[in-house]
């Protein structure tokens, strides 16, 4: 998730607010890092199947920006659809799906894949995580 933590430097320089205004770049950076970290090809298939047994699915990628006390959410679902929504007065109250309280710009992602077990059995598993983008 940290690879996708791109911020608007002009906004930060003039207002000291951390805002991520380029959702597409953040998602693209996330995809590059995911492929590299999990050793995936361009079709999200593992280059070796020792542990991950098939395609890695991006279930959700969500960017939360904080503007005053409001949270602006941009979410990409597994089918590629994008949802944008603003939640008024939710700073410090709203959480990501994995329970992280949103206090600053935050990125959440969830992936799913088939995991090869010890006796060659397989199980579809999910992994999710959140990262806060802060200046301290």
Q: Which residues are covered by each model-predicted region?
A:
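Short, conserved structural patches
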Residues: 4-136
């Amino acid at each position: 998730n940290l690879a996708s933590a791109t911020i608007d430097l002009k906004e930060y320089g003039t207002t000291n607010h951390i805002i991520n205004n380029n959702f597409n770049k953040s998602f693209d950076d996330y995809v590059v890092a995911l492929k590299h970290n999990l050793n995936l090809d361009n079709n999200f298939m593992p280059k070796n199947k020792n542990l991950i047994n098939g395609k890695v699915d991006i279930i959700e990628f969500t960017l939360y920006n904080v503007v005053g006390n409001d949270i602006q959410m941009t979410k990409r679902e597994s089918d590629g659809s994008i949802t944008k929504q603003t939640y008024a007065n939710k700073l410090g109250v709203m959480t990501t799906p994995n329970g992280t309280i949103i206090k600053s710009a935050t990125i959440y992602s969830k992936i799913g894949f088939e995991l090869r077990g010890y006796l060659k059995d397989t199980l579809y598993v999910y992994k999710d995580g959140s990262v806060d983008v802060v200046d301290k």
